[in-house]
């Protein structure tokens, strides 16, 4: 990794440091339900405080901007549920989500609970600012002493954050002498606080924190210098979300395993009958192209050989349902595939266990439903059983599945960034990384 890190700066004492964190943690009734992202940010924050910096923390939380601006954007979770519905039902479901979102109070996405938790973890050295660039933030930043922290309010309470507004960037830049990005989860976003404040030349010294350093070291090195056999596993709902990832990983891996909803487009491309399973008909030709590419390169591309099917998508998502198992290319016309079957679980697991490098992004089925979680559990277990292998879980739903199923401590690395991991797997340059200073 050729980017400067916090350890490359020799004198932090008295320096004002703006640290972009990812505190977008799940909340229920104002209570944090998973604090892993907060814990992940602590090494950088503690290092800066211990070295006498005046630390200004900033982050987003959810998508309040869409409600405040009256342009509601679907969350990934909502989009996933809608995509799994029959096409005729999707528009009505989308409108129902939008109407519900418009009635919500965006202020429930305040970062104040995060500030309280940080205070508990850092010994009452964190002050919460009730705005981002307003008078409260300005006063608290000005009063911040060496070895103390100020956490700004949710950046996305300002539309200017995502629009890279120059004046907003200037106000953020006025808080600091040095910028630190430690939010890998948003490193693929080119927003005011993730990249533009440096791109506009407003802050000259910009380095990465320990969290981003770890992400880049583990994931980038495994992609560029993998031990073989190298097995990549892709799941999730849509082929369209992973076009570039499929293509790039085929160049690097020995075996590419395709599961989840995206597998049915590949199966249909092979002439299979997939019933009402999720299919992206516009990507059929692309799937054929990728299968031919794998064949031409001598790479192995594995698809499910059997599938767990049901008549309707569970509603709610964890509702009890009746299922059966059929060959993956013989799904009845009125049925849909929602998980990989037992023969596929064994096939995939054996391939994973024999690997020396494994990268996984995307669940094998609707793991939120216990009846449809067996495929995802089998993959997680296989990663845990892959002796001597480097095993990497690429954030998002895969990371959630690992945590939910109890495998988080049994793999080499779980990324903190879903979208950022995907773009790294795709070989893209991440704006939040590219803007940082290179090492001499």
Regions found by a protein language model. Give the residues of each.
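Active-site loop-to-helix "anion-binding N-cap" substructures in soluble metabolic enzymes
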Residues: 1-440
């Amino acid at each position: 990794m050729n980017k400067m890190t916090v350890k490359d700066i020799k004198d932090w004492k008295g320096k004002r440091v703006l640290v972009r964190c990812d505190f977008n943690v799940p909340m229920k009734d104002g209570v944090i339900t998973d604090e892993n992202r907060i814990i992940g940010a602590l090494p950088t924050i503690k290092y800066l405080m211990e070295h006498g910096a005046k630390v200004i923390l900033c982050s987003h939380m959810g998508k309040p901007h869409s409600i405040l601006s009256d342009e509601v954007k679907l969350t990934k979770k909502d989009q996933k549920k809608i995509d799994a519905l029959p096409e005729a039902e999707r528009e009505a479901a989308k409108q129902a989500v939008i109407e519900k979102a418009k009635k919500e109070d965006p202020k429930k996405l305040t970062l104040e609970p995060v500030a309280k938790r940080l205070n508990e973890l850092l010994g009452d050295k964190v002050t919460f600012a009730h705005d981002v660039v307003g008078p409260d933030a300005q006063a608290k930043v000005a009063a911040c002493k060496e070895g103390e922290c100020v956490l700004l309010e949710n950046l996305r309470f300002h539309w200017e954050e995502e629009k890279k507004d120059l004046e907003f960037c200037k106000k953020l830049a006025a808080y600091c002498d040095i910028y630190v990005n430690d939010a890998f989860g948003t490193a693929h976003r080119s927003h005011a606080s993730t990249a533009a404040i440096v791109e506009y030349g407003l802050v000259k010294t910009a380095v990465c924190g320990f969290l981003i350093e770890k992400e880049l070291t583990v994931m980038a090195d495994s992609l560029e210098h993998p031990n073989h056999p190298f097995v990549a596993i892709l799941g999730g709902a849509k082929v369209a979300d992973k076009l570039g990832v499929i293509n790039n990983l085929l160049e690097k891996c020995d075996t590419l395993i395709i599961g989840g909803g995206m597998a049915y487009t590949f199966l249909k491309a092979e002439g299979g009958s997939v019933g009402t399973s999720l299919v992206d008909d516009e990507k059929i030709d692309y799937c054929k192209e990728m299968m031919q590419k794998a064949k031409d390169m001598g790479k192995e591309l594995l698809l499910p050989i059997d599938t767990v099917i049901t008549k309707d998508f569970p509603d709610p998502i964890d509702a009890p349902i009746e299922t059966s198992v059929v060959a993956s290319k013989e799904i009845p016309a009125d049925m849909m595939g929602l998980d990989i079957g037992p023969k596929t679980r064994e096939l995939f697991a054996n391939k994973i266990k024999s690997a020396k490098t494994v990268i996984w992004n995307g669940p094998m089925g609707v793991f939120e439903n216990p009846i449809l979680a067996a495929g995802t559990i089998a993959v997680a277990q296989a990663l845990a059983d892959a002796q001597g292998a480097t095993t990497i879980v690429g954030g998002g739903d895969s990371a959630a599945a690992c945590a939910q199923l109890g495998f988080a401590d049994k793999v080499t690395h779980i990324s903190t960034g879903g979208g950022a991991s995907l773009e790294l797997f795709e070989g893209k340059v991440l704006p939040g990384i590219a803007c940082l200073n290179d090492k001499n």
